[in-house]
């Protein structure tokens, strides 16, 4: 879905495809929003990664260097961003792919080590499951029929994710270099099919890290260690956020409490006055400190709460993992940090050069000029990410931040891509309307979330408009409760990031269809863009499609055609059967079963273990061996192909009359006949 057709266009970037399908103006406009959304979205990555290493490795917040006191946060970010820029500059997408492949092969056994260590430390039936089940009604972590009271991560959050998977397919371009990296469209599709089995122990490890951290912090058997981790985390987070002198009293009170265990009248007052929406009975120390900081600065209190919650599991893991495994996990995180930085910086830098600078310039660069400009822009992306991370204060969950910044582009990008690849009636006007509406809604959400506490809510209260706004906003969400529950409170914007994202997406789909139908005069030549029929390039294999009959229907469903080898067929069938029989089949059976006779929580705990640990564990053992051998073999094949590859300097991303520059001669020859 989308992957195959996109590769058939032979576009190197999404912007190039947009100019082929719509217009040059739309390519530049879309790339501007795309790069703005992507670069800002990525710009928080270095902050999260650096802060993780500081808390997990217990690094000091400041270090002295020749008499200068420097923030460790900035030094760690600078170190990893510099390493990523060097890797990207050495060889671009090829270097990134090779580096990622090698790091991936090296990481497989390390993932397994961390997984085994966590399973040895915590028993599923004795430690993890009882802790996960000990939740208030409507906030279950295991029973999907009992999550009505989860405000931010409930069924609506899942629904928006599913909706986005369909309507925003391929829209996110953080890894856009890989979308055009395969040797042909068939291999691009098979690479996506292989991805079903690729994750292996990585998925298990990520899941177990979260469950183990939660168990450690909330199970009474680990209460002593959890208390120490919480105190250490709170003290470090306060010093991280509250560097100004106005917070000295807060830090003094906290330090006294941590040293003596006695609560002063001031602390008692803060503890009694907690009024934040996200207060947690399991985190009284965090809430107490947050209340004390809010007296001086509500925004700083929000930042403290966000960082405290983000670093809670990393701090717990430092207390959980044994010596040796702690270092293994740290090495894994460094691998993943560099891998992510290289891929994202290359993607956003390429989009800026290829889809903004190149079409605005209107004429070709020399290969040397283009490569030099790419390196400079990629370094600029790294510099922006460094300073943004250094100065930006997080006020939302990380996933929520990704959702709202991504919505600047994703709010309207999906219909432009899916419609452009599959619908001949889509027009430039429809695409412009979709992207514009999605961007406005998303940016409006960002501004509202950022200014709600200090400006919008106080202004509404002072002008007497608060009552009317409360009635309208809360009334709009009432039919969708408990999944969508908007409450007008002083400390947080009532509509969360995922809800803003969905509103933008839905608006985009409706606008794309309506405006395209109103402005479309003729159908687009899809065969020319996809290089099909008479437009097929020399040397490319012609795909033979079987007629749809009862005997061929099953192959049609799987997309099997003349390009499939025996290995491809086996792989496709394995993924289809796993997804349909195990994945979707279990969903249908469990939904019907629980609608008739609801499972007890203990059954859900056992099912979670089987579905997320036992079966993936078996797959992980096989895929670790399979991808280690196969990855090494494919690396060898890649280098062999690169030795014989012929360069075409016309294939530089330019588009002439809806046709890529390197295809112009071929199209004229075909249409001239």
Q: Across the structure, where does each feature detected by a protein language model lie?
A:
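Solvent-exposed, non-transmembrane helices and loops of integral membrane proteins
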Residues: 644-667
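Cytosolic juxtamembrane helix at the C-terminal end of the final transmembrane segment
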Residues: 520, 631-642
């Amino acid at each position: 879905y989308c992957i195959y057709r996109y590769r058939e266009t032979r576009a190197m970037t999404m912007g190039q495809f947009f100019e082929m399908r719509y217009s040059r103006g739309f390519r530049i406009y879309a790339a501007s929003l795309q790069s703005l959304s992507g670069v800002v979205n990525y710009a928080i990555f270095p902050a999260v990664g650096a802060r993780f290493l500081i808390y997990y490795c217990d690094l000091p917040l400041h270090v002295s260097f020749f008499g200068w006191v420097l923030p460790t946060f900035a030094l760690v970010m600078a170190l990893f961003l510099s390493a990523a820029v060097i890797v990207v500059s050495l060889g671009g997408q090829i270097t990134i792919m090779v580096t990622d492949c090698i790091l991936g092969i090296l990481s497989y056994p390390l993932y397994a080590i961390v997984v085994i260590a966590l399973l040895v430390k915590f028993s599923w039936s004795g430690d993890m499951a009882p802790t996960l089940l000990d939740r208030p009604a409507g906030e279950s972590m295991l029973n999907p029929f009992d999550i009505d009271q989860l405000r931010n991560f409930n069924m609506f959050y899942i629904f928006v994710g599913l909706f986005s998977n369909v309507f925003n397919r391929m829209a996110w371009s953080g890894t856009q270099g890989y979308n055009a990296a395969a040797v042909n469209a068939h291999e691009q599709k098979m690479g996506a099919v292989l991805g079903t089995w690729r994750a292996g122990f990585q998925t298990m490890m990520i899941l177990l890290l979260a469950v183990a951290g939660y168990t450690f912090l909330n199970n009474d058997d680990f209460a002593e260690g959890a208390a120490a981790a919480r105190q250490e985390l709170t003290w470090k987070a306060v010093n991280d956020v509250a560097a100004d002198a106005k917070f000295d009293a807060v830090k003094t009170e906290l330090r006294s409490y941590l040293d003596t265990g006695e609560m002063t009248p001031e602390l008692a007052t803060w503890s009694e006055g907690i009024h934040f929406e996200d207060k947690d009975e399991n985190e009284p120390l965090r809430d107490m400190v947050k209340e004390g900081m809010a007296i001086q600065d509500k925004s700083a209190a929000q930042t403290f709460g966000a960082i405290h919650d983000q670093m809670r599991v990393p701090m717990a893991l430092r207390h959980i993992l044994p010596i040796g495994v702690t270092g293994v996990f740290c090495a894994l995180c460094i691998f993943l940090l560099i891998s992510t930085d290289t891929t994202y910086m290359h993607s956003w830098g390429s989009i800026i050069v290829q889809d903004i600078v190149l079409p605005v310039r209107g004429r070709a660069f020399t290969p040397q000029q283009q490569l030099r400009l790419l390196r400079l822009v990629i370094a600029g992306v790294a510099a922006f990410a460094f300073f943004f991370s250094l100065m930006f204060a997080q006020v939302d969950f990380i996933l929520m931040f990704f959702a709202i910044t991504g919505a600047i582009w994703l709010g309207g990008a999906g219909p432009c891509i899916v419609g452009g690849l599959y619908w001949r009636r889509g027009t430039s006007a429809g695409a412009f309307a979709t992207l514009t509406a999605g961007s406005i809604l998303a940016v409006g959400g960002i501004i509202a979330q950022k200014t709600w506490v200090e400006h919008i809510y106080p202004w509404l209260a002072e002008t007497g408009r608060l009552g009317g706004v409360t009635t309208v906003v809360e009334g709009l969400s009432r039919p969708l409760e408990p999944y969508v529950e908007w409450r007008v409170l002083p400390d947080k914007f009532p509509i969360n990031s995922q809800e803003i994202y969905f509103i933008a997406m839905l608006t985009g789909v409706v606008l794309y269809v309506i405006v395209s139908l109103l402005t479309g005069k003729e159908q687009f030549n899809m065969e020319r863009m996809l290089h099909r029929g008479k437009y097929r390039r020399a040397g490319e294999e012609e795909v033979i499609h079987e007629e749809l009959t009862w005997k061929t229907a099953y192959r049609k469903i799987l997309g099997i055609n003349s390009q499939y080898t025996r290995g491809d067929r086996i792989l496709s069938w394995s993924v289809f059967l796993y997804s349909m029989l195990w994945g979707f089949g279990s969903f249908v059976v469990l939904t019907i079963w629980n609608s008739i006779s609801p499972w007890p929580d203990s059954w859900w705990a056992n099912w979670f273990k089987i579905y997320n640990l036992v079966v993936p564990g078996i797959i992980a053992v096989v895929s670790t061996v399979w991808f280690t051998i196969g990855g090494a073999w494919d690396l060898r094949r890649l280098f062999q192909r690169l030795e014989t590859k012929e360069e075409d300097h016309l294939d530089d991303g330019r588009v002439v009359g809806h046709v890529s520059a390197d295809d112009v001669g071929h199209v004229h020859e075909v249409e001239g006949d």
